[in-house]
Each structure stands twice: as structure tokens, then as C-alpha cells.
Amino acid sequence: MKEKHWIIREDYDLETVEKLAASLGVDRIIATLLVERGVTTFEEARRFFRPGLDQVHDPFLMKGMKEAIARINEAIEKQERIMVYGDYDVDGTSAVALVYSYFKDLDRTIDFYIPDREREGYGISYQGIDYAKETGVKLVIALDCGIKATEEVQYAKQSGIDFIIGDHHLPGDEVPQAVAVLDPKQADCPYPYKELSGCGIGFKIVEAHLERKMGVRLCDLPEQLDEVRRARQEELKLKLLKYLDLVAVSIASDIVPIMGENRVLAFFGLRVLNTKPRPGIEAILKYGHVDRRKADAADQTDTAEKPKTGYFEKELTITDLVFLVGPRINAAGRIRSAFDSVRLMLTEDVNIARHLADDINNYNMERKELDTAATEEAKRRIEKDPFYRGRHSLVLYDPGWHRGVVGIVASRIVEAYYKPTIVFTKGSDDLITGSARSINEFDVHEALEKCADLLEHFGGHRCAAGVSLKQENMKAFVERFERLVQESSGGKEAVPEVEVDAELGFSQITPKFLRILKQFAPFGPENNVPVFVTRELVDTGNARVVGTNHLKLSAIPIAERTAPYPAIAFQMGEYISRVRKGERFDLCYQLEENYWRGKTEIQLNVKDIRFCE
């Protein structure tokens, strides 16, 4: 295992921490965690701990929203056929399900379309546009894709089909000539929050349309409204709340920041999931051993913002969505057809949901077999082929690898070697297609921009991107990409880092501390589960290796008279002999609730272990 560099965060003002701790009546560590997340005043802390739907931004601040809603209303008035188009991953399919279900509720003649990963690839395809033309579609709402589809949108325009683009990926130099392009990452877009998911963009379209229809805004403060408008706003909240479960699934699965507006949307989305989940999500969760409470059925929502929860035996978190829901929904688009994922999220029939969930879970098991085999082969090549020795990047190609798993394989290679990685396989139209995954220190999208002359298509984010190129350009691309990575690191090998929020003694882990810490949720990028360091620990003598090389131990401080805490250290079984010998160690960990057989206990999720000299 590659040695990690621990970085104790000190990027905060001590005076600000002390003032915040005093005003909130909390200890210094809690105040430090807040300041590290940009929460520096009592009012900011109130909004952080008590998210409200009035904290979302006015959707009409987004460039193009006014034009988008006008064109949608025109289509409704003229009874034109609308098609919702989306990417085949969780973000895209949840966005399609959200927008499609909203307009379907309005009794609109509407269709949806997801491109086939193998035949059409990522983004807006000519086949999809041809399908729209054949079925009489006049307006396409594209979600989680399209920001670079200039030629495809022009092709549709020639066929009398208008496009509304709703994307969150980085734009290129040229923006499609659509009726409206909704993407907060456009340089001239004044929308205050830039990190919405693709499904989040879809939600803002629905929010904007419903606000215009009802004559009240979600972001209006209730105390500033008269009684009639306040009642109308409560109705608006209830109408919109039912879509936020899909937004939460997309936020978790697409690994977007969970601060600002995303945190509000995820917070209420989780409330919906924990109160009255849609049949498809509940059916999928059964495969993660998350079951409905046996004693009592789901409580109904009392108000839009204060529902009674407790539908499942355990409270669903972002982590459950990341590991239990997202991979399964993704598997349909990776292995078979993402249409199944959309149908799963749309159906209100419990039996149909169960059948679809069965199929999707089978796809996921097949996906696991494929990505495990490809990952093992990729690692074997890296270890045995002299070409990879001393390289700062890893680019691998095998025409036999399944297109649906190359992104997962790239992620696993980054985890193992901590180097920017691109995994390629055979694509369509005689192209090589692949997925790039990066490390914290390297912007892979920026690097691909510097290789654009060698590429046919690329798009994505700082840490993940899709790319395709011609076979004859592969060698030149590999060498240029390697050079860019070397230049970025100054020729030094990147070292994985663990960012530590604070040092913590076990005696400081009080019920009040844990209660407040839990209120930091939902967790995710920019609001990660806090990482702590506790020093000078030993095991109580019951350490063992469980599962596939996971170290299970019970840690107790040498200097403190406190009870031990159970700890799990994934993929760290090689440390078992030293722990059993009674060697002292420092632990870098996250505090988490471990739910097992109806019981919940606090355990340490170990990020790294360092033995004392």
C-alpha cells in the first residue's frame, strides 16, 4: 500500500473559530469544522444546520431559463410533441425521469430517449435526432449532455427540431445554437451556484415552469408573503418536494459538491427517501439489505419541510445512495439499456418495480464480473510491462474490455497507483473510446483540452472525463498526456494525501459531540465526513482480518482512561501482525454509525494507520 501524507488542516482563523464557538455554545473542534467549511457566523451556522427550501436560488437567474420556459409553454400551447433526452448514467437517467414525469403529470404528449452506450456513445446522437424526427418531435430537452453538441443541434434544426440544452459539464469554445443553453458553468451565466448536477438542472427547469404557473417563488421568504401567497408557496413546495429524491440520487452518484444549493436539495431529497420512497428506489434498496420497518408503515408528510421520517429500519444517507443505489442504476446503462433505469424510477407499480430491480441487479452482478476481470488484467500489465515503469500517468487499451466498465476500471487503477489514468477500449466508427480519472493535483479536463488536436471527442470535469480518438493518434496522445502530467507535478511522483480536519481525543467523543457532528450531513465533496487523528493507540487484543483483507480492531488510547472504539480498516490486513504484537499506532479515521442486525454502534472508519517509532 502506498504511504499517505497526512495534512492537518490549519487554513482557518483562530479568532473566528473562538467567536463562533462562543456564539453557538459548542466546543472548539465543532467550530473549527464549521469554519473550514466556510461557515463563520451564527446566521450562517443556522442556515447550515437548518436548511430551508427558501435557500435555493431563483431559477430565472440562470442564463437561458426565460427562453427555455417560453419555448416549453409554446410547445404546450401548440400541442407539439416533446422529447426528454439524457445521458445513460445515474445523473442523466434521473434527470430524464424527473423532467419526463413532471410533464407527463400535465398530460403532455411526451417521450424520452437515452442513447445506447455501445452504438451511439455519450451525448446527443444523430440516431436520437432521427428518432425524434420519425416520431414527430418538435422540441428536445437534453439533460446532462449537449453542451458541446454544436453539429448535432444544427442537424436537428435543419429537420425542424428545436433544442433546449440543460447541462453541467464544462463548455467548449463554441456553444450549440439551441433555443436555450442552461449551464451555470458558462462564463457569462450569472447563476450564483455553479455545481448543480445534470438532474439538478432538470429540477430548476421544473421549478421555473411551476413557479411561473403558480405565481410564487420557492426562494421567497415565507415571512415576507401574505397568507394567500404563503399557502400557495407551501403548495409549490409539496409539488416540487416529490422530485428531490431523484436529485439527491444524482448528487450522490455524480460526486458533485454538497455545499450551497446542492446541500439543500440533497437534504430534502433524503427526507423524501426516508419518508415515502418511490417503488423503484425501495426495490433497489432491498438488494442492499435496506428493508422497510416492520412495526409501522411510512409516516406521511406533515408539512413540506418537516415530514415525519422512519420508513426504513435504518436512516438512508448519501453513502447508501453512493454505494447501494447509484451503481445498480448505472449498471443498466453499462450492460444493457438505460431505459430500464428510467422505467424503474418512473413506475408507481410495486410489482413492475420489483421485476425491473431484479433485472438491474443482475446487470450489476454482470458488471462486477466484467470490471473485476478488466481491473486484474490492467494491473497485471502495469506490473509486468516495462513501458509503465517510472511513468507519471497510466494509459491502457484493450479492444476486448467492455465499454460500460472502463470508467470503473480507471477509478480502481487510480486507487491502486495514484496516477492520472485513462482506460480505452474499442469504440464505434473505428474510434478508440475511453474514460479518464484523475488525482486531486491534476486537472484531466484541462489536459485533454491541450490534446484536442489529437482527439475526436472529449468532455467532463476536472477529475473525470470521457474521450475518443483515432487509432493512429494513440501513440502521440499517450506521450503528450504523460508530458502534461510530468510538467504539472514538476517531475515528482504524486503522493496520496489524507486531509485531517482536527486532532481528537477519545474523551472528546461525547454524545453531544456526536449529535452535532451528525447534523453536518448530508456529507460529500466540500463537506466530507470529518477526518480526525487520534495518537498513541493500541489494540485491546482482538484484532483480526475479515472479508477481503480488511483489518478489524478495537482501539484504545494509552494515555486516556476511556472505553475502546471498534475500528475497521479496509484493505489494511497486512498490518495485523504489528497490531497483534501490541505496537502503538496513530489512527486517521472518520466516525460513523455501523448498522448491523438491528443495532447501531459508533465505529472508526480508518483512512490510514501509522505506527509510532
Where are these regions (language model features)?
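Cofactor-/ligand-binding subdomain signature composed of acidic, glycine-rich
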Residues: 1-78, 324-362
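N-terminal small/polar loop signature for handling phosphorylated ligands or for N-terminal nucleophile
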Residues: 63-176, 181-187, 373, 377, ...
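Functional cores that coordinate and move charged inorganic groups
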Residues: 134-137, 145, 150-334, 338-344, ...
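Flexible, glycine/threonine-enriched loop-and-boundary segments that flank and lead into catalytic domains
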Residues: 384-411
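Short glycine-cluster motifs
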Residues: 422-438
